[in-house]
Amino acid sequence: MARAKLPRSPSEGKAGPGDTPAGAAAPEEPHGLSPLLPARGGGSVGSDVGQRVQVEFYVNENTFKERLKLFFIKNQRSSLRIRLFNFSLKLLTCLLYIVRVLLDNPDQGIGCWGCTKYNYTFNGSSSEFHWAPILWVERKMALWVIQVIVATISFLETMLIIYLSYKGNIWEQIFHVSFVLEMINTLPFIITVFWPPLRNLFIPVFLNCWLAKHALENMINDFHRAILRTQSAMFNQVLILFCTLLCLVFTGTCGIQHLERAGGNLNLLTSFYFCIVTFSTVGFGDVTPKIWPSQLLVVILICVTLVVLPLQFEELVYLWMERQKSGGNYSRHRARTEKHVVLCVSSLKIDLLMDFLNEFYAHPRLQDYYVVILCPSEMDVQVRRVLQIPLWSQRVIYLQGSALKDQDLMRAKMDNGEACFILSSRNEVDRTAADHQTILRAWAVKDFAPNCPLYVQILKPENKFHVKFADHVVCEEECKYAMLALNCICPATSTLITLLVHTSRGQEGQESPEQWQRTYGRCSGNEVYHIRMGDSKFFREYEGKSFTYAAFHAHKKYGVCLIGLKREENKSILLNPGPRHILAASDTCFYINITKEENSAFIFKQEEKQKRRGLAGQALYEGPSRLPVHSIIASMGTVAMDLQNTDCRPSQGGSGGDGTKLTLPTENGSGSRRPSIAPVLELADSSALLPCDLLSDQSEDEVTPSDDEGLSVVEYVKGYPPNSPYIGSSPTLCHLLPVKAPFCCLRLDKGCKHNSYEDAKAYGFKNKLIIVSAETAGNGLYNFIVPLRAYYRSRRELNPIVLLLDNKPDHHFLEAICCFPMVYYMEGSVDNLDSLLQCGIIYADNLVVVDKESTMSAEEDYMADAKTIVNVQTMFRLFPSLSITTELTHPSNMRFMQFRAKDSYSLALSKLEKQERENGSNLAFMFRLPFAAGRVFSISMLDTLLYQSFVKDYMITITRLLLGLDTTPGSGYLCAMKVTEDDLWIRTYGRLFQKLCSSSAEIPIGIYRTECHVFSEPHDVRAQSQISVNMEDCEDTREAKGPWGTRAASGSGSTHGRHGGSADPVEHPLLRRKSLQWARKLSRKSTKQAGKAPVATDWITQQRLSLYRRSERQELSELVKNRMKHLGLPTTGYEDVANLTASDVMNRVNLGYLQDEMNDHHQNTLSYVLINPPPDTRLEPNDIVYLIRSDPLAHVASSSQSRKSSCSNKLSSCNPETRDETQL
């Protein structure tokens, strides 16, 4: 606060340096000195004290008028009391008027006070009447005294308020309606005190009802101000409307009753009846006014009603519509008695809303929760339509408001909420701005309700550290890039994670005639659950045993997959901590199963029967989801996993459990080189543990790197990346270059002074490329590189990474990636064939197309993916053998990936998707072939990860561990292993589980299966829209069906998958011959149907022609070769043809000159993911098994020797693709 500078006193000005100041004689400070006026710097202390002046503030409020104004008007609570008193006074006057009417008797005579009374009678046949009954009434003395006192008080209060609220215009206040009514109802009573004959004068005191209405409105406003309630307009308007109706009826009743004293002499009840009948427009006519004054009053009342009420109703309807838009309030009473969560979003779309509601209410214990949506924008038509459905209208409340306003947070009762979900708007053009809004919302909620759990979704990883205080945070770009990276080495990781984080009962596809759809849908119901080991029926018998032992036997006995645990004293979750980890009763176990153990029932009747027969019992599990019984007895002479033919011996050092170990016999037969499956030990045996998968005894020479390759391998070192592109990235041990690569060497297509390479072939990579197409090199792209360069990946199997960027990366990003080996970038786009060829697409195994930020929003809904879909379709037809993973903005657009207009199988899947959506499935899109195969992904599918964390607070941590975003010491990592024909002696998934647990302590969690299908176009309307023929079906083999309908493939049989063999069906004469045989059989069946033979014949002809049509594919190959030569790329062995421009090639593809869609290799196979399949699931060639491999650095000192010897026995790499060394 500014203060005036005090002038020097004359004595101070004359005093010299050595003089004593005049103020020294008064050293005491004056009482009440303002602390805002410190002592001046000049002179002595005594002089400063003498010059100080006491300043008193707000002296204007000390006047009598201001004090009265503060009490009557300004102060909320005191003014509320005054208005309440005034309201009570007006009601009292109305009550006294009614008492006066009831006590009045016109038959006793009418006249002034103290005068002679006369009786007046009304002649109904005449229109004349007397005014005396209207002017004079009978008023008792006591009643008159009370009315005079009340009128005097009201008059004085009115005069005081007029004085206090005077603003310079007295006439405006005098002619105000309320002042006029006050004078009419109070001043006559005061006059009667001085003029007694007027004491019986009629005074319309009933008009005080309007003053009472006005006082009530002011009182409610003050009350709302006192309790800080601002959202009360709707309540006020309803109250005003009700009071207006009441005042109109009361005024009409009293007015007609009084005027009819000179006419029909009606009582109050009859007058009230007449008013109600008249205002309701019924008008029976049994009671009517007799004289013209009362008739005139009725007309005036009707006119006033016709004017006032429509205005009131209009205001009420307007406020009602505004309230419908804003959503009203969530009452404090409901917030205290009910449970609710708040969803904060920038804009609410129907897809986001349904994903949230379906996932949130999929959990049984959340059925009684309410969802309060706080959104600043108006509710759109689709959302409004959904929220009107009874299923959601009773549980979802939409409030229009901002999370930055405390008033809106109060409306949502955020401080009473069970949780607050804050979601970013991913479809914004400026995603950084969207993150900033999310951060502010999170801060506002934390400030307003610090105890409310926060679940925050952030887009950019560099913004994540701003919301680290939140209970759960999901960074979209971190998860997206890590998942797309794992898709390249563990196929369909995106599908695996998506299915795990969606709540499902595994009932999808169970009505389908296709076996793979039933199995795939059943396994999709597996989720991650947790339970304390001491409370678990699944795991408590394994206390004191190794983690691997418990995982294998729990899967064998109950069909559950134990994937990790958490120590009671440690907050870190460990995935597959390895066989050296001994389970304790206090451990929290995390497992994959159809449903949680608490909802499972255990049936042991069959086990008791087997025990009576002398056989080793097998526990059966039959949960509420009807999980089939797991039969784990192997057949056909192979080594059995049960205890039927094994020797039992006491366990060594094991406590609890069954006290036995498996001692499995060796395989019979001469010339067999397959080892038997060793038992899983209760306690770890360091000498027997190998850190890699040992499904076959490959020779050491097969995996020993050559000398040339060994030189390149030695160049890499293990360490932590020195430069993180953003704050908050988890440190991960990676393969690094000993010396950072210069920025110029990171450019793939341009040589520099360090090397002259200008294309991918010149580098001579040993492994095939992984190409990532992105618009910009954002910080999230760093998380694509880290999982592919993690220390636990084999150095021999590191794939070169090429970043195909639309815009040049900045130096900050290059500084972060220059330490990684074989990471390059190139400027270009996926819609440019030259760019694709220059970055080495013909030498690549995987192409990842990342959704572009600039195209995430479109004027028309769901059109944001149009460009991406068309570009990927072009590449799909140009390079059919390339594995392309595409990110889309909208999951519903995945049906356009690898689109084939005449594919009846896709049409059948579309019908199945609609059926599942009608059944209320959260995974209706799961049967789309691109999604099942892991070739398409949308980050919105991972929104459920944040929602599911409300019930499972560990899901985000487990997902980040699986994706390699976080590394916890002692925790395992996700990898994959390919099953070849040489490994089919294992036969079943359960035996594979035992093999992996006993040899390398790896935990399998699922299978990625690829099957060969011949897609047809049936013409029987009663038949399904697809006919699938497996290779085994073509060979007319009869295979045993398991409980889940899985095929029992023979060891010599092969299933044509997309990971093996050529993409050209010409090279498979057996497939072609069998397909034609199948077509002829189908043709013979079709001829039995009358009227359909010509159609079937045309269709068979078309199929035959499509099997032999290869000219278009050859033409496309020539076009691509020609573009390579034009760009100066190596084309050894290609014929010289005339050059064509890149646009010519693209146009010829898009115009449909290539007609051989039905023969492409990708289109003859389908792939899908089986999460935690039953133990008796048969393995098939080209199956890829998802593994959680234990941390290689967990026990380096004790296992370094065994790891050195294990390298020669590794079956195959974690990379699911063929890892043959190829010199490009």
From Swiss-Prot:
<feature type="binding site">
    <location>
        <position position="806"/>
    </location>
    <ligand>
        <name>K(+) 2</name>
    </ligand>
</feature>
<feature type="binding site">
    <location>
        <position position="752"/>
    </location>
    <ligand>
        <name>Zn(2+)</name>
    </ligand>
</feature>
<keyword id="KW-0597">Phosphoprotein</keyword>
<dbReference type="Pfam" id="PF03493">
    <property type="entry name" value="BK_channel_a"/>
</dbReference>
<feature type="topological domain" description="Extracellular">
    <location>
        <begin position="113"/>
        <end position="139"/>
    </location>
</feature>
<feature type="binding site">
    <location>
        <position position="524"/>
    </location>
    <ligand>
        <name>Na(+) 1</name>
    </ligand>
</feature>
<feature type="binding site">
    <location>
        <position position="828"/>
    </location>
    <ligand>
        <name>K(+) 2</name>
    </ligand>
</feature>
<feature type="binding site">
    <location>
        <position position="745"/>
    </location>
    <ligand>
        <name>Zn(2+)</name>
    </ligand>
</feature>
<feature type="compositionally biased region" description="Polar residues">
    <location>
        <begin position="663"/>
        <end position="673"/>
    </location>
</feature>
<keyword id="KW-0633">Potassium transport</keyword>
<comment type="function">
    <text>Sodium-activated K(+) channel. Acts as an important mediator of neuronal membrane excitability. Contributes to the delayed outward currents. Regulates neuronal bursting in sensory neurons. Contributes to synaptic development and plasticity.</text>
</comment>
<dbReference type="GO" id="GO:0051289">
    <property type="term" value="P:protein homotetramerization"/>
</dbReference>
<feature type="topological domain" description="Cytoplasmic">
    <location>
        <begin position="220"/>
        <end position="232"/>
    </location>
</feature>
<feature type="topological domain" description="Cytoplasmic">
    <location>
        <begin position="1"/>
        <end position="79"/>
    </location>
</feature>
<feature type="binding site">
    <location>
        <position position="744"/>
    </location>
    <ligand>
        <name>Zn(2+)</name>
    </ligand>
</feature>
<feature type="binding site">
    <location>
        <position position="502"/>
    </location>
    <ligand>
        <name>Na(+) 1</name>
    </ligand>
</feature>
<feature type="compositionally biased region" description="Low complexity">
    <location>
        <begin position="1198"/>
        <end position="1215"/>
    </location>
</feature>
<feature type="region of interest" description="Disordered">
    <location>
        <begin position="1"/>
        <end position="37"/>
    </location>
</feature>
<feature type="topological domain" description="Cytoplasmic">
    <location>
        <begin position="165"/>
        <end position="178"/>
    </location>
</feature>
<keyword id="KW-0325">Glycoprotein</keyword>
<feature type="binding site">
    <location>
        <position position="773"/>
    </location>
    <ligand>
        <name>K(+) 2</name>
    </ligand>
</feature>
<keyword id="KW-0862">Zinc</keyword>
<dbReference type="GO" id="GO:0098839">
    <property type="term" value="C:postsynaptic density membrane"/>
</dbReference>
<keyword id="KW-0407">Ion channel</keyword>
<dbReference type="GO" id="GO:0015271">
    <property type="term" value="F:outward rectifier potassium channel activity"/>
</dbReference>
<feature type="binding site">
    <location>
        <position position="750"/>
    </location>
    <ligand>
        <name>K(+) 3</name>
    </ligand>
</feature>
<dbReference type="InterPro" id="IPR047871">
    <property type="entry name" value="K_chnl_Slo-like"/>
</dbReference>
<feature type="transmembrane region" description="Helical; Name=Segment S4">
    <location>
        <begin position="202"/>
        <end position="219"/>
    </location>
</feature>
<feature type="binding site">
    <location>
        <position position="283"/>
    </location>
    <ligand>
        <name>K(+) 1</name>
    </ligand>
</feature>
<keyword id="KW-0813">Transport</keyword>
<feature type="compositionally biased region" description="Low complexity">
    <location>
        <begin position="1045"/>
        <end position="1055"/>
    </location>
</feature>
<comment type="subunit">
    <text>Homotetramer; which constitutes the Na(+)-activated K(+) channel. Interacts with KCNT2; these heterodimer channels differ from the homomers in their unitary conductance, kinetic behavior, subcellular localization, and response to activation of protein kinase C. Interacts (via C-terminus) with FMR1; this interaction alters gating properties of KCNT1. Interacts with CRBN via its cytoplasmic C-terminus.</text>
</comment>
<feature type="transmembrane region" description="Helical; Name=Segment S2">
    <location>
        <begin position="140"/>
        <end position="164"/>
    </location>
</feature>
<keyword id="KW-0630">Potassium</keyword>
<feature type="binding site">
    <location>
        <position position="747"/>
    </location>
    <ligand>
        <name>Na(+) 2</name>
    </ligand>
</feature>
<feature type="transmembrane region" description="Helical; Name=Segment S6">
    <location>
        <begin position="291"/>
        <end position="324"/>
    </location>
</feature>
<feature type="compositionally biased region" description="Low complexity">
    <location>
        <begin position="13"/>
        <end position="27"/>
    </location>
</feature>
<feature type="binding site">
    <location>
        <position position="526"/>
    </location>
    <ligand>
        <name>Na(+) 1</name>
    </ligand>
</feature>
<dbReference type="InterPro" id="IPR003148">
    <property type="entry name" value="RCK_N"/>
</dbReference>
<keyword id="KW-0106">Calcium</keyword>
<feature type="binding site">
    <location>
        <position position="763"/>
    </location>
    <ligand>
        <name>K(+) 3</name>
    </ligand>
</feature>
<feature type="topological domain" description="Extracellular">
    <location>
        <begin position="289"/>
        <end position="290"/>
    </location>
</feature>
